[in-house]
Regions:
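Interdomain coupling/hinge region of P-loop NTPase helicase/AAA+ cores
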Residues: 1-107, 201-205
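Switch/connector loops and helix/strand junctions flanking conserved nucleotide-binding motifs
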Residues: 2-3, 46-47, 87-88, 110-112, ...
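Short, surface-exposed amphipathic charged segments that create phosphate/polyanion-binding patches used
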Residues: 48-53, 118, 211-214
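Amphipathic alpha-helical interaction motifs in eukaryotic regulatory proteins
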Residues: 50, 66-70, 90, 94, ...
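Short acidic active-site motifs
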Residues: 64, 111-115, 133
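Conserved RecA-like helicase motor core of SF1/SF2 enzymes
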Residues: 97-99, 104-109, 121-125, 130-184
Length: 214
């Protein structure tokens, strides 16, 4: 992971960039002193973030998530597109021995704060969250982000991935992609105007097979 992060940083430093001042210098304004309001959305992730993907069939996603949580211990923020998914995964992971806590809009505020506190205090745990519930909440100490489903937009992807690799720390973002989501995934990457490709996370299949059986 460290070698991959170093190569990513080298590519980012070598890429030319157009600043707002450069673009404004090319525009012929009628007003000598135009008022400029910048409304661009931040679509860059941290240089210390390692991004990867895992392609699998939909019925194997649970097993792949469990594999990630066992293979890469730490605090993992798992984004799910719907509340029903959170409600299904939390008891499943708990049954498998993974401390798992829900975060979604139908929880009382007190329960959300309690789950966040439990997640922060645990050295190894999973926080299952919807995008709406996670917005505006400062979740510190996240080691990994898992996109259990491909996000619906490029901005959502950046927002999710930005929950790790903060303040100079290293972090990992892994997208679980089933065949029906490949088109959306490619559209997100195109919208981000990223030239690099996302590497496929290596999977130890000898380790994954018994997980499927569970």
């Amino acid at each position: 992971l460290k070698r991959a992060l170093w190569r990513k940083k080298q590519r980012r430093e070598a890429e030319p960039s157009n600043t707002l001042d450069d673009l404004l210098a090319r525009v012929d304004f009628r007003d000598a002193e135009p008022v400029v309001i910048e409304m661009a959305t931040q679509r860059h992730v941290a240089d210390t973030l390692y991004e990867a993907k895992m392609e699998c069939v939909g019925q194997d996603k649970d097993a792949y998530l469990y594999y990630i949580l066992l293979r890469y211990p730490g605090r993992t923020l798992v984004f799910v597109n719907a509340i029903d998914g959170v409600r299904r995964l939390v008891p499943l992971l708990t049954l498998l021995g993974i401390p798992a806590y829900p975060l979604h809009g139908q929880l009382q505020q007190q329960q959300r704060l309690k789950n966040l506190d439990r997640f922060r205090r645990a050295p190894h745990a999973a926080l299952l969250a919807t995008d709406v519930a996670a917005r505006g909440i400062d979740i510190q100490g996240v080691d990994h982000v898992v996109h259990f489903q491909v996000p619906r937009s490029a901005d959502t992807y950046v927002h999710r991935a930005g929950r790790t690799a903060r303040a100079g720390r290293e972090g990992v973002s892994i997208a679980l992609i089933e065949p029906s989501e490949l088109r959306l995934w490619r559209a997100i990457w195109q919208a981000l105007e990223r030239q690099d490709t996302v590497p496929t996370m290596p999977v130890e299949y000898t380790f994954l097979t018994p997980i499927r059986d569970r």
